[in-house]
Amino acid sequence: MKITVEDGSQISKNAVKELEKHADMIECQCPNKLIEILHKVREFTDYTEDCIEKYPEDRDTHKWLKSSAINLDQLLSTTIIQLARFEGFIDENNEFVDRGEGS
């Protein structure tokens, strides 16, 4: 499986799930912690979208918050991909490495 990004710079949900499976390849929990933060940012992005509809008087504020959350998502996505490459989860072509399971 290849890591893919959506909207140009956000890691896809399927790639996040696959990375979660590979995160046990190293002892430290940094990959898992970053993925947890990414999930929270995505929840917040969805929440701000709801606020845009629910609170039209604060529409501009919530649009700004949503835009900021998307920027955080993009930063976290690129950080997670680079960390996965550093730790050997993925290769230079963003393909997941074979863990050698079942051999």
Name these PLM-found stretches.
Residues 1-22, 88-103:
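Terminal, compositionally biased segments
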Residues 10-26, 50-60:
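Short, charged/polar, low-complexity loop and linker segments
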Residues 66-103:
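Amphipathic alpha-helical binding modules
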Residues 38, 50, 60, 77, ...:
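Generic alpha-helix signal with a bias toward terminal, lower-confidence helices
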Residues 6, 24-35, 59-63, 67:
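Short, solvent-exposed segments of well-ordered alpha helices
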Residues 48-51, 55-58, 62-69, 90:
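Amphipathic alpha-helical coiled-coil oligomerization segments
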Residues 29-50:
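Amphipathic, heptad-repeat alpha-helices with coiled-coil/zipper character that mediate oligomerization
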